[in-house]
């Protein structure tokens, strides 16, 4: 290669490298006493915001912090005995709120405007935070595609501690969630293609919930000392009106006998303590290799909401309430009051096989065997 060509090639390489470096997402470091929201507002899409240990309260009146930019990585640099805490203050209802800009103040957080238009925010992650004391949601995502919520602690958030809704391709892992007094610790609602693994939920009305969602993989989680360990269900008045293709495997549902403390005006106030897993109206769910231990009413329930509460299915309804094609296989039931509560109503194609003990104690109808 001639010196001219070599010089030209090096110049082009240098120009390309410089251009790439100039486009690299920025890293912003936030220290205790700094404004988290100011750092978010200053960040470019794709930026990483590293938050040093300390107690932060956020600047928002309703939402402590709000993120409407794509690709933001929020990293709590927690160290041993030095957490990164987002603490509720004043009139704040929600902790970390992530959504497209048009959906920061929806009339109903479960019916976000972005969901009606199939608009999405692409890319978000949060890790290493302790989010506590919010009367609404601890961590809320709506219409977010490609997200990660990993290694956080959410406690004392009264409605939902971690709540992705109308979102897709997400990973929720290694979170510790507790003290949600009105509803679910971790709630996957109207979502698609979500992995939920190795989380712990305790002291909530519902430990984990999958509602009106598809292709959710719930594995390796522990639901302990909740009113109900987990709920897989379908409800009306949602943008997504079906639920199917979900897998609940290798989880532990233990001692879910907590008294129900939900406000009387909440639907969740009707949940009777003592069931590890409630599958209500869902279709095509695989319940496999879970452990159900010391639940005071039943290890699990597979029911039609129309049987449990006929008023729930009073016409008109915009969903199919019958639980169909659910498989319950190779699970272990230990010292529950009953193993299975089975009232499928008009549901068809449900079956049980390979569970331990081989003969399960049942409340309701005889269990159909998988062929």
Where in this protein do the model-derived segments appear?
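Acidic, glycine- and Ser/Thr-rich low-complexity intrinsically disordered tracts
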Residues: 272, 308-371
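Right-handed parallel beta-helix/beta-spiral solenoid domain characteristic of secreted/periplasmic
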Residues: 24-34, 53-60, 64-66, 70-135
């Amino acid at each position: 290669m001639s010196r001219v060509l070599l010089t030209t090639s090096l110049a082009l390489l240098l120009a390309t490298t410089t251009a790439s470096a100039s486009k690299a997402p920025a890293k912003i470091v936030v220290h205790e006493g700094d404004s988290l929201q100011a750092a978010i507002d200053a960040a470019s899409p794709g930026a990483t915001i590293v938050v040093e240990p300390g107690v932060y309260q956020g600047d928002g009146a309703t939402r402590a912090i709000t993120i409407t930019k794509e690709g933001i990585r929020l990293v709590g640099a927690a160290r041993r005995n030095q957490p990164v805490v987002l603490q509720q203050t004043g009139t704040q209802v929600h902790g970390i709120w992530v959504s497209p800009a048009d959906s920061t103040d929806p009339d109903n957080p479960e019916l976000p405007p972005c969901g009606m238009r199939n608009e999405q925010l692409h890319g978000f992650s949060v890790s290493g935070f302790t989010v506590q004391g919010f009367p609404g949601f601890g961590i809320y995502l709506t219409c977010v595609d490609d997200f990660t919520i990993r290694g956080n602690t959410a406690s004392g958030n009264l409605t939902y501690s971690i709540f992705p809704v109308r979102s897709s391709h997400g990973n929720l892992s290694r979170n510790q969630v507790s003290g949600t007094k009105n509803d679910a610790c971790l709630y996957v609602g109207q979502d698609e293609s979500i992995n939920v693994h190795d989380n712990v939920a305790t002291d909530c009305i519902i430990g984990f919930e999958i509602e009106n969602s598809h292709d959710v993989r719930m594995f390796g989680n522990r639901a302990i000392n909740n009113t109900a360990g987990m709920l897989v269900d379908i409800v009306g008045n949602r943008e997504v009106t079906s639920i199917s293709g979900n897998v609940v495997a290798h989880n532990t549902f233990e001692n879910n006998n907590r008294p129900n403390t939900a406000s009387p005006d909440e639907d969740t106030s009707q949940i009777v303590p003592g069931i590890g897993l409630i599958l209500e109206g869902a279709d095509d769910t695989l319940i496999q290799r879970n452990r159900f231990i010391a639940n005071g009413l039943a290890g699990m329930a597979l029911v039609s909401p129309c049987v449990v509460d006929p008023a729930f299915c009073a016409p008109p309804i915009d969903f199919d309430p019958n639980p169909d094609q659910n498989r319950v296989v190779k699970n272990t039931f230990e010292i529950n009051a009953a193993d299975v509560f089975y009232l499928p109503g008009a549901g068809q194609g449900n079956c049980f096989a390979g569970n331990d003990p081989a003969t399960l104690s049942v409340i309701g109808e005889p269990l159909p065997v998988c062929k």
